[in-house]
Amino acid sequence: MTDAATLSTAGFDLTPPTEAERERLEANLTAEEARVLLHHGTEAPFCGGLLGEKSPGVYGCRLCGLPLFKHETKFESGTGWPSFYAPFAEDHVVGVRDTSYGMVRIETRCARCDSHQGHVFPDGPAPTRLRYCINSVSLQFVKAGAPLPDPLHRGDKIT
């Protein structure tokens, strides 16, 4: 953790990457990952690699590794994108008003690195009635029991 770390309610370091760290992380992205994560793109529906993933585990930010969603909150929405009814921790995902394409929506971003993840809609299942509609390419799946990726060397662990 950094000296002046901002910890999430789940104990993860939310300190944004430095400019040098961000450049290093961005250099490892594919063109499609960069288009979605950095330029607020959307992958085509029904083609994402994590859409059918049903294994126990955690879905983390593809850019910085912060855990964003738990497998227990994933559900089949029929929209063509992985959908979740709650984030890993409320303060791991940030909502930003998005008025692009003549619509009013809430864009979801990683609270640590500010990368685009998808959108949240008020049409999900109980208990939250929310649907976090997330691009597969924005996420990396970590099977239960496997160590979390730690590209920023923050020492974050699920306890």
Swiss-Prot record:
GO terms for cellular component: cytoplasm. NCBIfam families: peptide-methionine (R)-S-oxide reductase MsrB. The keyword Cell inner membrane does not apply. Keywords: Metal-binding, Oxidoreductase, Zinc. Its EC number is 1.8.4.12. GO terms for molecular function: peptide-methionine (R)-S-oxide reductase activity; zinc ion binding. Belongs to the MsrB Met sulfoxide reductase family. It is an enzyme of class 1 (oxidoreductase). SUPFAM superfamilies: Mss4-like. This is Peptide methionine sulfoxide reductase MsrB. One of its GO terms (biological process) is protein repair. The lineage of its organism: Bacteria, Pseudomonadati, Pseudomonadota, Alphaproteobacteria, Caulobacterales. It comes from the Bacteria. Zn(2+) binds at C61, C64, C110, C113. It holds the Pfam family SelR. Binds 1 zinc ion per subunit. The zinc ion is important for the structural integrity of the protein. Gene3D superfamilies: Peptide methionine sulfoxide reductase. Residues 22-144 form the MsrB domain. PROSITE patterns: MSRB. It catalyses: L-methionyl-[protein] + [thioredoxin]-disulfide + H2O = L-methionyl-(R)-S-oxide-[protein] + [thioredoxin]-dithiol. The active site is at C133 (nucleophile). Its cofactor is Zn(2+). PANTHER family: METHIONINE SULFOXIDE REDUCTASE, METHIONINE-R-SULFOXIDE REDUCTASE B1.
